[in-house]
């Protein structure tokens, strides 16, 4: 039976601030069949692309990417905030509404020429994912696609990653 994954996303009005509708994937993760269906769709996308490594940005990219990597029998590399990774890293800086942020990836996480899929729970403005792509490419990896549970179409995040094949399971 195919579930409508939209039924497993809670829409919270005025969170984290007035005028924002927060899309909460907790109900999806709390339902084994919905989580499995979403994960399996990304696994199929990854297999079709010959993916050899998954990279996900902190923290919800881990929730999406780890089960995909596990099921495929491949590795997962976390892109993390400053001070969270113990070995030598590369850095990418990206803009936020009020300032800048940084993501890091350990230098030995990606092999040159390795086919990489980047996963996250949600594509909004595209800044975090563009920074994650930059990290992978600095290390010589080939980003063969990006995959998300949710895409917020009005924020035009896909424009920042338009050169990459992108899978979004749900759009709002």
UniProtKB/Swiss-Prot annotation:
<dbReference type="GO" id="GO:0044209">
    <property type="term" value="P:AMP salvage"/>
</dbReference>
<dbReference type="GO" id="GO:0006166">
    <property type="term" value="P:purine ribonucleoside salvage"/>
</dbReference>
<comment type="subunit">
    <text>Homodimer.</text>
</comment>
<dbReference type="InterPro" id="IPR005764">
    <property type="entry name" value="Ade_phspho_trans"/>
</dbReference>
<comment type="similarity">
    <text>Belongs to the purine/pyrimidine phosphoribosyltransferase family.</text>
</comment>
<dbReference type="GO" id="GO:0006168">
    <property type="term" value="P:adenine salvage"/>
</dbReference>
<dbReference type="InterPro" id="IPR000836">
    <property type="entry name" value="PRibTrfase_dom"/>
</dbReference>
<dbReference type="InterPro" id="IPR029057">
    <property type="entry name" value="PRTase-like"/>
</dbReference>
<keyword id="KW-0328">Glycosyltransferase</keyword>
<dbReference type="GO" id="GO:0002055">
    <property type="term" value="F:adenine binding"/>
</dbReference>
<keyword id="KW-0963">Cytoplasm</keyword>
<dbReference type="Pfam" id="PF00156">
    <property type="entry name" value="Pribosyltran"/>
</dbReference>
<dbReference type="GO" id="GO:0003999">
    <property type="term" value="F:adenine phosphoribosyltransferase activity"/>
</dbReference>
<protein>
    <recommendedName>
        <fullName>Adenine phosphoribosyltransferase</fullName>
        <ecNumber>2.4.2.7</ecNumber>
    </recommendedName>
</protein>
<comment type="function">
    <text>Catalyzes a salvage reaction resulting in the formation of AMP, that is energically less costly than de novo synthesis.</text>
</comment>
<dbReference type="GO" id="GO:0016208">
    <property type="term" value="F:AMP binding"/>
</dbReference>
<keyword id="KW-0660">Purine salvage</keyword>
<comment type="pathway">
    <text>Purine metabolism; AMP biosynthesis via salvage pathway; AMP from adenine: step 1/1.</text>
</comment>
<dbReference type="InterPro" id="IPR050054">
    <property type="entry name" value="UPRTase/APRTase"/>
</dbReference>
<keyword id="KW-0808">Transferase</keyword>
<dbReference type="GO" id="GO:0005737">
    <property type="term" value="C:cytoplasm"/>
</dbReference>
